Regions:
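Leucine-rich repeat
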Residues: 1-129, 138, 142-160, 176, ...
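Short, conserved loop/helix-junction motifs that constitute active-site signature segments
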Residues: 134, 163-168, 193-196
Length: 258
């Protein structure tokens, strides 16, 4: 099908049954998004043998495992994955157990500028581990199902923060969604107090009345933010419709350019 579509740029695979291990070779594709949720046997492995113009690769499903082997994707800049994703860039294996875990880096992984994470729990340790391995990362989008039990960081990451080997280059952070728990507050304040070039942070919430916003602007220490020009906003979370949570999130944030 792809070979017969020489102008195809965007490929959205949803509940595709029958083909468990499709292989892709395409000179024109710029975006691939996969939702392999299905009651019937669906895609288990996606092999991208060659996609020289691929810029965006996203796995949308939280609940069904998908092994993605990206063998040649030299222009890839936007990567989306969930707890059910296992990624291989060339010889670099990126595994997801309860969250992201990096095993070394390939050249393609080093060029990632935008990371979209579908996490079962909002876990600061896992996010920091990813950041230390993506040196060009500028945009971070996170959708989480619940808060992690503990995101304390001041003692644990004191040495890392002051290290010359670690610098946060993030300019954009979007969190879906912010519940206002102690764990959420600790997660967000890590970036508020340490992201020196941050330009925009959006926290999706289920209430943004004046009282809630005032309380949490104080708890998040926004007056002490490392980037004085950063715009930090609380936005009401939209209702989930359509294909999947990750899909809606990517559409709303213009990550998938349909």
């Amino acid at each position: 099908m792809i070979a017969r579509s020489p102008s195809l740029e965007f490929l959205l695979i949803i509940r595709c049954t029958g083909a468990r291990r499709p292989r892709i070779n395409s000179f024109t594709l710029t975006t691939i998004a996969v939702d392999n949720h299905s009651p019937d046997p669906s895609i288990e492995e996606l092999v991208i043998e060659s996609a020289p113009h691929l810029q965006t690769l996203i796995h949308l499903d939280h609940n069904h495992d998908l092994h993605i082997a990206a063998l040649s994707v030299p222009k890839l800049e936007t990567l989306g994955c969930t707890n059910s994703t296992r990624l291989v860039f060339g010889s670099t294996d990126i595994r997801h157990h309860q969250g992201p875990c990096i095993r070394g880096l390939a050249t393609a992984a080093c060029k990632i500028k935008c990371l979209v994470l579908g996490m079962a729990t909002l876990n600061l340790h896992m996010v920091i581990e990813l950041m230390t391995n993506f040196p060009c990362l500028e945009k971070l989008y996170i959708q989480c199902q619940k808060s992690w039990k503990n995101n304390l960081w001041r003692r644990k990451y004191r040495g890392l923060i002051t290290s010359t080997c670690f610098d946060i280059h993030l300019k954009t952070i979007v969190l879906d969604y912010y519940r206002g728990t102690k764990s959420d507050i600790d997660f967000v304040t890590f970036f508020v107090l340490n992201a020196r070039v941050l330009e925009r942070m959006k926290l999706l919430v289920k209430r943004n009345d004046d009282k809630f916003v005032a309380i949490h602007r104080h708890r998040l220490q926004l007056m002490n933010r490392a980037s004085h020009g950063a715009h930090i906003n609380f936005r009401l979370k939209d209702s989930d419709v359509c294909i999947s949570n990750m899909y809606n999130f990517c559409i709303q944030e213009n990550i998938l350019n349909l």
